[in-house]
Amino acid sequence: MAVKSSFRNMVLCLLTICFVCSALLAGVNVLTRGPIEKGRVAKVEKAVAAVLPQCNIVSERQEIEVDGVRYGYYAARQDADYVGCAIESSTIGFGGVLSLMVGITADGSISGTQVLSHSETPGLGAKCTDPAFSSQFKGWDSSVKKLEVRSKGGDVDAITASTITSRAYTLAVANAVKAFRDINASLNGDSGEEQNEITEGGQTNE
């Protein structure tokens, strides 16, 4: 009888501990969800402003599917003039998912790129965040220069000893350029609706 009572008490104790831990975790999740989301939005807004500095009006985040892949994008204007889009594009690098924000102007040239997140090796692939590498894409005209690293016949200077990361970064940019063609066609065909969606702001291998 004492054994049964001891077992029952142990089970009740474990259940109580599990309940308390679950409640604490739920509470922490509720408390941190807001700040985390606020930080994410601020990071995106900063990236959009960095890759499309010539805009002062940015739409809410929209999505488009191209070849089975979904891309988030932000259409941008300078007052009444459409100036381009900031497009979220992700690929797999050496260490995991590599996510970029790619700015493309209305004429199709790249106005800038910025890393949103990565898991690349510090001191090697992580150098993809350095302007020494990323700045080469600014002003890029993909109709003139090939978006591929030089070792594969393209015009992109790879990061030393980080070919996989360099190729992944370049592929993310190339995919954004491809998505932009469909986005641009969609915006041009839906200009009235797009104008209504525009809001003030603009300030979201190794």
Regions found by a protein language model. Give the residues of each.
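Flexible, solvent-exposed loop/hinge segments and secondary-structure transition points
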Residues: 2-206
